[in-house]
Amino acid sequence: MFLHTKLENRKEPIRIAFIGCGKFVSMFLAQYNHLDKIQIDSIVDLNIEQAKRNCSNSGLDETTISEINFSKSLDEILDRNIEIFIEATGNPIFGTVHAVKIIKNKKHVILVNVEADITCGKYLSDIAKENGVICSMAYGDQPSLIIEQIEWARLNGFSVVCAGKGLSLIHI
C-alpha cells in the first residue's frame, strides 16, 4: 500500500515534534496546511519567538500556532504523546544527544541533520535497533538523496563505484 493511502487510513493523525525550527522545518511548515493526518505537537528551539515567526511566515494561522507546544528543552517534551521526532538543528553534537535521548525513550527519530548522521549515524542506528524504534534520514537531505541515486543506478544495472555530493566544490 502506498504511504499516502496508509496515512489517510489512520484514525488519528501522526503526532510529531520538531527540534530546531529553521529552513528545513519552515519548508515543511509551508505544506502543513495541506496535511490532514499529521499534527505538530511540539517545536523545540532556543529562540521560541523566532520559531513562532517562522511558523507564521510559513503560512500557519494564529490558531494553529497556539495549539503547538513550544519549548527550549527536549527534556520537557519527551513524555508527551509524540510518535516521531524530527531532529533538524544541524549541529552534530546536539543532534546526536537529542537523537540518543529520543531513541532511549522508545520514540522514532528522523534526522534532518546530515552532520549528526555522518558522525554518529551507525551508532544511532544500532541503539535504535536495540530499542525497537526507527532512526531514519529525512527524504530531501543529502544522505537520503544519495541513497536514492545509488538505488536508481543499481536498479538500472549500473555498478556504483563512488557516490557523494560535490556541489560545494563547484565555484559558480
Give names to the regions the model predicted.
Residues 96, 101, 114-133:
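Rossmann-fold NAD(P)-binding glycine/threonine-rich loop
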Residues 1-58:
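N-terminal Rossmann-like dinucleotide-binding module
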Residues 145-159:
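Oxidoreductase and adenylate-handling cofactor-binding alpha/beta cores
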Residues 124-140, 156-162:
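Rossmann-fold dehydrogenase core element
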Residues 46, 90, 114-117, 140-141, ...:
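Short, ordered loop/turn segments at secondary-structure junctions
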Residues 108-110:
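A short hydrophobic/small-residue beta-strand
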Residues 170-172:
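Conserved small/polar residues in nucleotide/adenosyl-binding loops
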Residues 62-93:
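A structured beta-alpha segment of the ubiquitous adenosine-cofactor-binding alpha/beta core
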